[in-house]
């Protein structure tokens, strides 16, 4: 896993009783196949390779093709964490950036993030679902009596959670009602806002853009600001109902982090945020 991987990845490995081999990323926060090879060396005990289809902290899409190649060489399971960013694949102009996703053994995407579905809507997709059924199917006389068809699809056999809601139904209704084009337009709006914010930060003498955004996340510095200044800035924006922002760290340094997702966020928010940083 990358040093930028979501905390839930390490937690899942801990539950499984597996140790994580943390692979350092460079200034661009992107996990690459080359970096994995360098970290693994001659080890032959690698079971899983996890890459991100849009990291949480920086919105970076890992080198999925390179990571998939290394996973195949190691005979390891290749999982892509696309909980936040994989939805951007709905945009034709973004699909090339996800080259390699087709080689994943499994991937995850959360419609409750960038598809605006109710909280808890999550899709875990397997290349070979029978492996998941073999792993997760629970048995008991009170359960087996319901299995009258060997080919019947039951989500409870594809994960460790037994009783569950039909959380995919609201996603289907939203897509059926609004259509894919409406979802594409909403996602694209977030990308446009991120690019405009990045350009404004890059043009300002008081701020420094850390990296060009790939998705809707923008990381930046403000000259002379430290942790306390970032905290006050975030609190003021929330108090004034301008925006809810949560500063983060980049390589241990407190920095600003903006995430653009809501399709009704006006373009004028860029000017408001810049005024709050320079006023």
Can you say where each PLM-predicted feature lies in the sequence?
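PLP-dependent enzyme catalytic core of the Aspartate aminotransferase-like
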Residues: 74, 250-279
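Short, glycine-/Ser/Thr-/acidic-enriched flexible segments
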Residues: 4-6, 27-28, 54-56, 85, ...
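Conserved PLP-binding catalytic core of the aspartate aminotransferase-like
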Residues: 208-237
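Short, hydrophobic beta-strand segments
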Residues: 173-174, 219-221, 256-261
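Conserved PLP-enzyme active-site core in the AAT-like
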Residues: 1-133
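Conserved PLP cofactor-binding pocket of PLP-dependent enzymes
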Residues: 212, 217, 240-257
